[in-house]
């Protein structure tokens, strides 16, 4: 993992916690860790093969997480959720009645799957789970992975556990 991170990090620093999470995901083969590493490379301003995901954003919903940011990374298993969100966002131009009278299943499937995915990628709006990091003085500190069901307190506790490695983050991770 350290060798791969060495290729993807320009000035950023990566916590031992995140390194362990990546190693576990690689060993279990439950994530393509290279997709995560490519997102880190993108955040570092390096050439990247990363999927067109949403831009990095600060955590705004909870003051506890102020100063932390998250960046989506995409995995194939997130495809259905992305397609579902996209098809809800953009209704079909044809009416249901018109389709019922002359069903063109191939066109419908294409629009539901390929069309929705193309729209989402064109807008760089793919979503997935998160890389949690803290930008400070031009350096990104990559702390942990999280998902939509990881509670804010847990994200904060994981991030705060990295203070022994990165004491300079104390102002960001104030309690």
Regions flagged by a language model, labelled:
Residues 1-128, 137-175:
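Basic, Lys/Arg-enriched alpha-helical interface segments
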Residues 131-132:
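Hydrophobic/aromatic beta-strand elements that line small-molecule binding cavities or substrate pockets
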């Amino acid at each position: 993992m350290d060798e791969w991170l060495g290729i993807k990090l320009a000035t950023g620093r990566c916590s031992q916690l995140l390194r362990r999470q990546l190693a576990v995901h690689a060993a279990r083969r439950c994530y393509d860790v290279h997709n995560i590493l490519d997102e880190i490379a993108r955040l570092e301003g390096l050439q990247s093969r990363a999927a067109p995901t949403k831009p990095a954003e600060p955590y705004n919903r909870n003051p506890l997480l102020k100063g932390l940011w998250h960046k989506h990374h995409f995995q194939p298993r997130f495809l259905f959720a992305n397609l579902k969100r996209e098809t809800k966002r953009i209704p079909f131009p044809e009416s249901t009645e018109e389709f019922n009278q002359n069903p063109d299943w191939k066109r419908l499937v294409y629009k539901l799957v390929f069309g929705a995915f193309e729209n989402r990628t064109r807008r760089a709006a793919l979503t997935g789970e998160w890389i949690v990091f803290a930008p400070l003085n031009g350096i990104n500190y990559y702390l942990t992975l999280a998902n939509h069901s990881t509670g804010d307190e847990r994200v904060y506790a994981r991030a705060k556990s990295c203070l022994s490695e990165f004491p300079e983050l104390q102002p960001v991770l104030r309690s």
